[in-house]
Amino acid sequence: MKQIVYVASPESQQIHVWQMDNQGALTLLQVVDTPGQGQPMVIHPARTHLYIGVRPSFGVVSYRIDEKGLLTEAGMAPLPGSPTQLTTDLQGETLYSVSYSGSCLSVSPIDEQGIVGAPTQTLEGLTHCHSANVDTTNQVLWVPCLQEDRIRLYTIGEAGHLTPRTPEALDSVAGAGPRHMVFHHGGGYAYAINELSGTVNVIAIDAAGAGPRIVQTLDIMPAGFSDTRWAADIYITPDGRWLYCCDRTASVISRFAVSEDGGVLRLLGHQATESQPRGFNIDSQGRFLVAAGQKSHHIAVYAIDAQSGALDPLARYAVGQGPMWVSVLAR
């Protein structure tokens, strides 16, 4: 299986394209200059296109991915606010973009050629929304709003159109600052990382038919940590056994064991990583983790131990300036 790693570095306005071999070693294939500061990326479910949000001219760039994993720009469409995170629905027909600074969420069509068009719907007043997350049924969009301390919930309708659900939101603890999310492959649980409190919530998606409910909250920080918490990203391995979170102040990745049904997390330890890890990702087989250091201007590759989930450092690679986002393509 061929795997390609894409790293977005907004300060140098670049995407570095790497091929990953079966041992986790990377070979640089391409450096793409982006039309502006590119930050959030997402790969089309069909693995034919990569999308990146850019600023200061707010927009999303569509890139075609060839058989080698190389990128060719294929189009650009406007966005209503500075893009913070992008996602697509599971069919690859709609792209959702959230803007933290603009406190808005936009819905954009993806045509049959895989090119993103102009937004057809914009929801405003989502105070400091930080991500949009499509559930495993492709029917519900979860939108953590950091300053509101809640996750808003929307039903996904025809052409990706969004309507508020009932209940319309899941409240977090005051001051938590919900940021990013992932879902357990079984569909019963979700996990949300809280930026300001440095915690992770386990969410029962439909607790006894009454809607979502937080069933566990765990600290992601090392014992005795007393500095400002600044949690950033969260990912789970494809088999649902291991979950990872990162914090930018401590520059660590925390590791959790996930119960078989997904409903319980257990903190196992912490791995020191690149300075200010804004983003990371896991390969499609759950064997490797790639973390980007926003201040170190490097990425680090770790092997994931199949028995313990522990991270074994393999190598570091220089990338562009201020890397913030990592996406992994499997072919």
From Swiss-Prot:
Pathway: Carbohydrate degradation; pentose phosphate pathway; D-ribulose 5-phosphate from D-glucose 6-phosphate (oxidative stage): step 2/3. GO terms for molecular function: 6-phosphogluconolactonase activity. Its EC number is 3.1.1.31. Keywords: Carbohydrate metabolism, Glucose metabolism, Hydrolase. One of its GO terms (biological process) is pentose-phosphate shunt, oxidative branch. It catalyses: 6-phospho-D-glucono-1,5-lactone + H2O = 6-phospho-D-gluconate + H(+). The keyword Disulfide bond does not apply. The keyword Metal-binding does not apply. One of its GO terms (cellular component) is cytosol. It is an enzyme of class 3 (hydrolase). HAMAP family: 6P_gluconolactonase. Belongs to the cycloisomerase 2 family. Catalyzes the hydrolysis of 6-phosphogluconolactone to 6-phosphogluconate. This is 6-phosphogluconolactonase.
